[in-house]
Design a protein with these regions (language model features):
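Conserved alpha/beta-hydrolase "acid-adjacent" motif
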Residues: 111-117
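Alpha/beta-hydrolase fold nucleophile elbow
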Residues: 1-9
């Protein structure tokens, strides 16, 4: 059996790994606001880095942690997630080996992984399609989400 593999951010890194290691089980890949981990790519902004450092140290400031839990987000897990992301290293060679139909979706205003991360991913995967969305950062904003989903469904229809 095979499936369309979709992942966003760290989930995109995981989806890339699945597509690389299990191409026979992957119908297609959608990598959203993710990265190859290449060290030459632009880093996050200083402000964003400071915010992540606060999360990593358990300083959630004015965040309503219970409300975040209701959305399925657990800020307490951020230190583990950040450790995994930063220790994943440069996966460019792995990403270059992806040989399934791929859509790369990325925000034009992503402060965590600037658009060059999406561009680099698309450049490495032969035949991939890249879409950069205005008004999207490192999130899935309600104003842009219908277009993201529509593009994804069109892509699946082509597969």
């Amino acid at each position: 059996q095979s499936a369309h593999i979709v992942g966003a951010s760290m989930g995109g890194m995981i989806a890339q790994t699945i597509a690389s290691e299990y191409p026979d089980r992957t119908k297609s890949l959608v990598s959203i606001m993710s990265t190859t981990g290449a060290r030459h790519l632009p880093e996050m902004t200083n402000e964003t880095e400071g915010n992540f450092r606060n999360f990593g140290e358990g300083n959630f400031g004015e965040i309503d942690v219970e409300q975040m839990h209701s959305y399925g987000f657990y800020p307490e897990s951020m230190p583990r997630q950040l450790t995994a992301i930063f220790h994943a290293g440069d996966r460019s060679e792995q990403v270059k080996n992806i040989n399934v139909k791929t859509l790369v979706q990325h925000g034009a205003n992503d402060p965590l992984l600037p658009p060059d991360h999406g561009r680099h991913t698309a450049e490495l995967i032969e035949g991939s399609k890249l879409v950069i969305y205005e008004g999207m950062g490192h999130d899935l904003p309600p104003e842009v989400l219908p277009t993201i989903i529509s593009d994804m469904l069109d892509f699946f229809g082509e597969t």
